[in-house]
């Protein structure tokens, strides 16, 4: 049976890791062993932050809606309660976009919410 030498596969694996770790600081981009550790950690951060990103954007939308609603003398929680009573089915992403881009349209939504709360 012939002897199996793994130089080609090892080189390919090292090359793949070093290519993926390009742009890392210091030896993290040039030394295979350190690059492998940094690359694994970077993938962990990426996995975690794909989930955190969703939370962060939701928090941003809520802050934008809250700021816009307070200009009309209302709080965020009261506004969301009024939306449900008025049966306006818009998510926070859309509401934040309207509040940010089109103040007049958002003012109309607030009027409908105030009407639903008064009733």
UniProtKB/Swiss-Prot annotation:
PANTHER family to which the protein is assigned, alphabetical:
39S RIBOSOMAL PROTEIN L20
Q: rRNA-binding as a keyword?
A: yes
Which InterPro entries does the entry mention? Answer: Ribosomal_bL20 (IPR005813), RIBOSOMAL_L20_CS (IPR049946), Ribosomal_protein_bL20_C (IPR035566)
Lineage of the native species? Bacteria, Pseudomonadati, Pseudomonadota, Alphaproteobacteria, Acetobacterales
| One GO BP | translation
Where would one find coiled-coil regions in this protein?
none
Provide the disulphide bond pattern: none
Identify the Pfam families for this entry: Ribosomal_L20 (PF00453)
Q: Name one GO cellular component term.
A: ribosome
Q: Which GO terms describe its molecular function?
A: rRNA binding; structural constituent of ribosome
Q: What does this protein do?
A: Binds directly to 23S ribosomal RNA and is necessary for the in vitro assembly process of the 50S ribosomal subunit. It is not involved in the protein synthesizing functions of that subunit.
**Species of origin:** Granulibacter bethesdensis (strain ATCC BAA-1260 / CGDNIH1)
Q: Which UniProt keywords apply?
A: Ribonucleoprotein, Ribosomal protein, RNA-binding, rRNA-binding
Q: Which CDD domains match?
A: Ribosomal_L20
| Record's protein name | Large ribosomal subunit protein bL20
Query: Which superkingdom heads the taxonomic lineage of this protein's source?
Result: Bacteria
Its family remark reads: Belongs to the bacterial ribosomal protein bL20 family.
- The protein's gene is named rplT
């Amino acid at each position: 049976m012939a002897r199996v030498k793994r130089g080609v596969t090892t080189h390919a694996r090292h090359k793949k890791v070093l290519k993926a770790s390009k742009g890392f600081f210091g030896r993290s981009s040039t030394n295979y062993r350190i690059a492998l550790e940094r690359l694994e950690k970077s993938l962990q951060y990426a996995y975690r932050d794909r989930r955190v990103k969703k939370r962060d954007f939701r928090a941003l939308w809520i802050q934008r809606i809250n700021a816009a609603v307070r200009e009309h003398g209302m709080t965020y929680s009261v506004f969301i309660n009024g939306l449900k009573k008025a049966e306006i089915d818009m998510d926070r992403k859309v509401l934040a976009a309207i509040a940010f881009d089109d103040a007049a349209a958002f003012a109309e939504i607030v009027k409908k919410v105030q009407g639903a709360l008064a009733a």
